[in-house]
Design a protein with these regions (language model features):
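Short helix-loop capping/hinge motifs at secondary-structure junctions, enriched
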Residues: 135-141, 160, 173-181, 260-268
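Short beta-strand->loop
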Residues: 38-40, 132-134, 152-179, 194-197, ...
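Ligand-binding pocket segment of bilobal, Venus flytrap-like solute-binding proteins
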Residues: 178-245
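N-terminal segment of the mature folded domain
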Residues: 30-161, 303, 339-340
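Bacterial N-terminal signal peptides
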Residues: 9-24
């Protein structure tokens, strides 16, 4: 009798242990994971779509639920927030120089971060275009038209916005080529352009709002994706996209933030999240949101959406961001010298 009771007790204990293990395993499978993607201004719609698809894929693959929170603003401003303590698991910023600043000032990821993913950790590209009102009433076709008297130009502040820095360099590069490499003439051209800028918003999306919704300005210097999105949201009967004679290859990079990921226990999923951007599914979402995909098959599918034009590059034409950032946008740099509000 005693033996049977002992066996029964062991059996019950085994059942309870198995149940607890099963429950524990189930709890692991149903983990609630949260990531923070600190991004630049005009990527809201892109990452809303990316996050939803990645979460579905991750759930199917692992059983875990993942929520990706988004933070958006001017790229330089966002980099400063991370440096000052905003706990980003990943950063998806407007230019490599802003992630380099996080390396240099906060030491949150290694200096060779750009080598960890394909295409220098830039899963998509973009360029800079001109958005005008329907019918192009001011006859704006190229950079020269932006310096004409009476033209009101909307562009954000290159001190805080990554897009604004691409805008500035595209205009500078145009003027430099037109004037045979004469930097004094390029500076005079860009100075004249900024004299036509009534207000510098802190980020690209703010400038788009100023132009599109507040109806300020004759022309918006814009990310291609934001210009295309404006046509989609507000109608081709409201605006037109103008491709200038030359622009710049904008390469927005991505990186996981190692020291934050270690603290959060999110290293593996942060890496997987950014790798998803390179998959055919991720590239499809990228193209659908008017960014230029790297995948050749996806790029061919959307070729009509992305006109070809001559493009300057940050490395070949400006010596890379480590040279361009202090020269043009550092304290006392070219922008500080040519931009005189109210003058």
């Amino acid at each position: 009798m005693f033996g049977r009771k002992l066996k029964l007790a062991y059996a019950l204990a085994a059942i309870m242990l198995a149940a607890s293990v099963a429950f524990g395993a189930g709890a692991v499978r149903a983990a609630q994971i949260t990531l923070l993607n600190v991004s630049y201004d005009p990527t809201r719609e892109l990452y809303e779509a990316v996050n939803a698809q990645f979460a579905r894929d991750w759930k199917a693959k692992t059983g875990d639920d993942v929520t990706i929170n988004q933070s958006h603003g001017g790229s330089g401003k966002q980099a400063r927030a991370v440096i000052d303590g905003l706990e980003a698991d990943v950063v998806t910023l407007g230019l490599a120089g802003d992630i380099d600043a996080i390396v240099e000032k906060a030491d949150l990821l290694p200096a060779d971060w750009q080598t960890r993913l394909p295409d220098n950790s830039c899963p998509y590209t973009s360029t800079i275009v001109l958005l005008v009102r329907k019918g192009n009433p001011k006859k704006i076709h190229d950079w020269d038209d932006l310096v004409k008297p009476g033209i009101s130009v909307v562009t954000p502040n290159p001190k805080t916005s990554g897009g604004a820095r691409w805008n500035f360099l595209a205009a500078w590069g145009y003027a430099l080529k037109k004037n045979g490499g004469d930097e004094a003439k390029a500076a005079a051209f860009v100075s004249a352009l900024y004299k036509n800028v009534p207000v510098l918003d802190s980020g690209a999306r703010g400038s788009t709002t100023t132009f599109v919704e507040r109806e300020i300005g004759d022309v918006l210097i814009a990310w291609e994706n934001d210009a295309r999105l404006s046509l989609k949201q507000f109608g081709t009967d409201k605006f037109e996209v103008i491709y200038p004679s030359i622009s710049i290859l904008a390469e927005p990079p991505v990186a996981w933030v190692d020291k934050v990921d270690i603290r959060h226990g999110t290293a593996a999923i942060s890496k997987a999240y950014l790798e998803f951007l390179y998959t055919p599914g991720g590239q499809e979402i990228i193209a659908q949101n008017f960014f230029r995909p790297r995948d050749k098959t996806v790029a061919a599918k959307y070729a009509s959406q992305f006109p070809t034009l001559p493009l300057l590059t940050i490395d070949a034409d400006f010596g890379g961001w480590k040279t361009a950032q202090p020269k043009f946008f550092g304290d006392g740099g070219v922008f500080d010298k040519i931009y005189q509000p109210g003058s």
